[in-house]
Amino acid sequence: MRVDGREKTELRHIHIHTNYLKHPEGSVLIEVGDTKVICSATIEERVPPFMRGEGKGWVTAEYAMIPRATEQRTIRESSKGKVTGRTMEIQRLIGRALRAVVDLEALGERTVWIDCDVIQADGGTRTASITGAYVAMVLAFEKLLQAEKVSKIPVKDYLAATSVGIVEEQGVVLDLNYAEDSKADVDMNVIMTGKGQFVEVQGTGEEATFSRAQLNELLDAAEKGIFQLIDMQKEALGDIVSHIE
């Protein structure tokens, strides 16, 4: 039994609140256990200069934590005057993952801005951001469809992400909280589509190694969790699902 009473391959409690904010075209508050992230999607009727004239759209992301998302207050990056390497890595990861399932030609020359703001962190903030951002993005696309600016919702598949790891005395576990993540021998983030295709796998041994058999076990656990997350995304999206499938 894990520190929070879960089974080894059991997700934390997940809740996706749709249309959480008033102004964005799409928004959600995603709760993954005690990790909470507000994800919003904004549609801009233009593309970056390097995309002009190509007839395709673009998806990009920004990620941030409020100062007391963590146990000890962290200084806002805006106060420091620069974005940290960790934040830049996560922003690129979110944008890259979402672009993998967006039909950029069907989107047209528009930019989707994804903003992920962590209001409480207890492990898995980047994976929660990706899972929530996908729903926010689809909600924004539904607005485009209703306005007859696109002929279909421009996504090719579902997308979700979770963490897996190897924790001493537990073995392979799914969806690590901060207490588990901080002592894990192996930590891995996995992003997959609804068709079971991998978008990205980030795995690291923390002063430890892992075998091919353990890698397979980690990926099996992640796949199980991601398919459950996609079912929750579908439930949150409701009737919009009929425009995707």
From Swiss-Prot:
It is an enzyme of class 2 (transferase). Coiled coil: none annotated. It catalyses: tRNA(n+1) + phosphate = tRNA(n) + a ribonucleoside 5'-diphosphate. The keyword Oxidoreductase does not apply. GO terms for biological process: rRNA catabolic process; rRNA processing; tRNA processing. Gene3D superfamilies: GHMP Kinase, N-terminal domain. GO terms for molecular function: 3'-5'-RNA exonuclease activity; tRNA binding; tRNA nucleotidyltransferase activity. Signal peptide: none annotated. InterPro entries: ExoRNase_PH_dom1 (IPR001247), ExoRNase_PH_dom2 (IPR015847), ExoRNase_PH_dom2_sf (IPR036345), PNPase/RNase_PH_dom_sf (IPR027408), Ribosomal_Su5_D2-typ_SF (IPR020568), RNase_PH (IPR050080), RNase_PH_bac-type (IPR002381), RNase_PH_CS (IPR018336). Its EC number is 2.7.7.56. Keywords: Nucleotidyltransferase, RNA-binding, rRNA processing, Transferase, tRNA processing, tRNA-binding. Phosphate binds at R86, G124, T125, R126. CDD domains: RNase_PH_bact. Phosphorolytic 3'-5' exoribonuclease that plays an important role in tRNA 3'-end maturation. Removes nucleotide residues following the 3'-CCA terminus of tRNAs; can also add nucleotides to the ends of RNA molecules by using nucleoside diphosphates as substrates, but this may not be physiologically important. Probably plays a role in initiation of 16S rRNA degradation (leading to ribosome degradation) during starvation. Homohexameric ring arranged as a trimer of dimers. Belongs to the RNase PH family. PANTHER family: EXOSOME COMPLEX COMPONENT, EXOSOME COMPLEX COMPONENT RRP41. This is Ribonuclease PH. It comes from Bacillus cereus (strain G9842). The gene is rph.
